Amino acid sequence: MALTLTGLANDIYVSADLVGRELVGYIPSVTMNSSDSRAAIGDSIKSAITTSATAAGITEAMSVPNDDTYTITNSTMSIDQQRAVRIPIEGEQTRTLQNNGTYSTTYGNAITQAMRALTNECESFLHTTIKEGAGFATGDGSLFNTSGSELDEIAQARKILVDEGCPTDDISAVIDTLSGARLRQVANLLNANQAGTGDIRTQGILIPVFGVNVRESAGVASHTKGGMTGADVNASEPVGETTIAFDGGTVNTTGITAGDVITFGNEGGGTADTTKYVVGTGSTSTSGTIVLNAGLKQARVASDEITLNNTHSPSHMFHRNAVELVMRAPAMPDGGDGADDVI
């Protein structure tokens, strides 16, 4: 049936308020790149990236020096998904709901469910993107240990970020409900005189921990590690290298997959390295290369063993500027389409 969308807008706003109280953690933690311009699937959108600055001495002069230059680069992203939820209601259903006096409530709930579905898809998409694009890992995949009495892992994850030069003003950690339950059990967070606020007790919300904004998300999912065993580094790899050559592996169907967490041994005589690296590009070959998202902290030599960490449900910590979410309205033909009404 046809709908008058100007009246529908109010229902959408009401539903948005309800959906905003779902377990949404990634969307409010990332940079939103959105506008009222429309884009087609596959369209490219550029995002400006500033580079490191170089300090210079000050010299007295009668004119402004112009020998310094500053380069602003860009990252090109593309629209690769177009998603929608349809809510067709037949005339018979409409009349029945109207006679019962429940049409507005039922239709509003349908809009809520539609927005919830799209929100959950976006959360899952961001979870996968961040998982496969992370640089380093710590702990066993959860920010909190099984006793719920310590916050060592969240402190260690923050250390990794700030050691890499991450700003400290807008860091977020997105966790699942299990980690959220453990966080709520930490005694000094439950005591207002120690935590500095009573919000976690009175409102059930997660609060900043060590300057990190902790949020829960229904989009956090388990990562199944690849099946590769026995792989060794087969060449010398310097500090900072991201492309690692390997051989001697047994694929076991899945090999090394994007998002896997790996460590390097020192069987070849290299320096021991306890850093946990995240794989950006994996391999299903017995030999070849894998690509890490962050460079090696210690040089590797041939025969150093590659070990995959266990299957886990990863929590993520990142700065807002580390992840950019591009959203545009779908493209429309210049002459319009067959819709009876549009907003």
Predicted segments with their positions:
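Residue-level recognition of conserved beta-strand edge/terminus positions
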Residues: 48, 264-266, 309
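Autoprocessing Asn-cyclization modules and mimics
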Residues: 182-301
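Internal mixed-charge
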Residues: 216-220, 280-343
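Glycine-centered loop/turn motifs
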Residues: 42, 59-63, 67-71, 236, ...
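Short helix/loop capping segments that flank catalytic or ligand/cofactor-binding pockets
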Residues: 55-58, 87-88, 97, 182-185, ...
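Surface-exposed ligand/attachment interfaces on beta-rich extracellular proteins
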Residues: 33-34, 139, 145-152, 246-254, ...
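N-terminal "assembly arms/tails" that initiate or stabilize quaternary assembly
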Residues: 1-80
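Long, contiguous amphipathic alpha-helices that act as assembly "spine/axial" helices in icosahedral shell
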Residues: 47, 77-153, 162-179, 204-207, ...
